[in-house]
């Protein structure tokens, strides 16, 4: 089974502040938990993995794609941040439907997928 997430000698600096230093790790498919004390780099690793921030050094691969600039990756990757970011005043239905429309689906496709998605929860 191939590893789905690969960090190769990755470092991230925020100006003079070190976020993570020379991290190399491979994560196989499945459920993985990052555990550590405050300031240990858990959020930085997640932000690097999703492309929200770019590494200062090293290489990252998620499902064979670089998170640096990969629209393909964002079609298959979901990420829930540690803070609420759901827009106020919008329903779950509208949020899913509008997101699908923004990703180029037709109205009929977006409607069908929204219904299917909400039936799962």
Predicted regions and their residues:
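Conserved ABC ATPase "signature" region
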Residues: 97, 101, 108-121
